[in-house]
Amino acid sequence: MATPLQIMPLPVWPITFLEDAVVYLSALFTPWFTAFCVLWLHRYVRLIVHCYSHWTYKSKPIPSKPSYTSDDVTVVIPTIHDNFDELRPSLESILATKPHELIMVTTADKFEDLQRVAKTLSSPNIRIFCTQYANKRIQVCEALPKITTRITIMADDDVTWPSTMMPWILAPFEDPKIGGVGTCQRVKRVREGGLGLRIWNWLGAAYIERRNFEISATHNMDGGTSCMSGRTGAYRSEILRDYEFLEGFMKEEWWGKILKADDDNFVSRWLVSHKWKTWIQYEQECELETTLEDNIKFLYQCSRWARSNWRSNWTSLVKERHVWKQQWWCTYALHIATFTSLAFVFDFLILAALWWGTEGWEPVNRNRAIYAQLAFLAFSKVVKLVGLFRRHPADIMFLPVSIIFGYFHGLIKIYAGLTLNMTSWGSRTDGDTDDAHRLAPGPVRCSSLNTPRSEHKLPHYMQERDEIVNEKQQMREEEWEHL
């Protein structure tokens, strides 16, 4: 007789372990501790990823047989400087890289003065043009039709280039899918003068250093960035001379008005929308030097940049929406973060949620958790500035100022978000002379058109208008008959 099949009972310990784990996790993840975890992950996942991405970032190497040389480059500089003689060092550094041509565009009232300075530079490859209004988009559009080279570099009038700039900024264009290339940046440091002057100078240097960190990290993740800097950026001329680009560049809308600020943001979004890739050359040989305001006017610059970020990131996320598919990491780490990364709010909430979320813990463990969070918070305030401290160790004295300003900058972002209709510079002489043209109502189509007497048929749009009028008249007559 066959032995009946016996079913062995399952051991009790796995079930007991799971039950204990559920009980433990339920006790651990109180509402406040859950809130802490969510806030912490939202704020710091991108920082941890960016640290790894930045530290492993590699620039495109210079090819042994480059397809592009300096003779393929035209440099365009819009300028409204009040003293063109001060631009001489910057212009000489750019001309030292031997571009095919340097085109400068100023306003009509400053045209002769700029020509005078250009003649003293002893270079036959400089052309000067002028526009009626002091506006970068208008000035750039004045220069673009004159360009005959394959690459166009748009630069600010206060940047100083290293002599090694050109081969490095051209190297990424070996990839035919690359449409734009940016550079590493540094602020010209002030080592003499009062403490206030050096503090403002440090804040500007720290601002640019953080930007270097972010754009290299995001490019290493998905090739994206919120903005290719207008201080110096190289682009394929075929992109900038395209009729659709020029029309969009001059007719971008914001709140029903024509926006002629945020030019570099528009170019960056255009590259994304037309599936061109971008790259950043994070090398000392491709590192330009620039100047920022070293007084309270720096706050005006910060508010202007913050407004540009609000407007451009909102356009990217809501209106154009290309980044959702093409740059998934930048969508989270840059675009969405614009609306959620207020340090003075999130740092406080994370600490408060951790304190209340560990209320039932042993005092020793609770203190360890708080100290660990404070240590990580300090790390987050320092890690993006490591390059700055490495070059100038004495700058560590300014770290408390940087942390305090980081919290204050949250207020600047809120103010900028509430004043998005403002486009003024506020920090540059003559910079706001034509501010009314930066955000102005667009042209309105005339409601009636006068057509000369002719035996020819009316234009198509006139026919459509008459058909609509007749249709509305017929509807009114039918309504009256019904009544």
From Swiss-Prot:
Pfam families linked to this entry: Glyco_tranf_2_3 (PF13641)
Hydrolase in keyword set: no
Name of the molecule in the record: Type 2 glycosyltransferase
Organism (species): Pyricularia oryzae (strain 70-15 / ATCC MYA-4617 / FGSC 8958) (Rice blast fungus)
Transmembrane segments: 21-41, 336-356, 369-389, 396-416
Residue interval(s) of motif Dxd motif: 156-158
GO terms, molecular function: glycosyltransferase activity
Locations listed in the record: Cell membrane
Enzyme class: transferase
Glycosylated sites: N313, N421
Gene Ontology annotations for the cellular component aspect, listed alphabetically: plasma membrane
Membrane-topology annotation of the record: Multi-pass membrane protein
Signal peptide (from-to): none
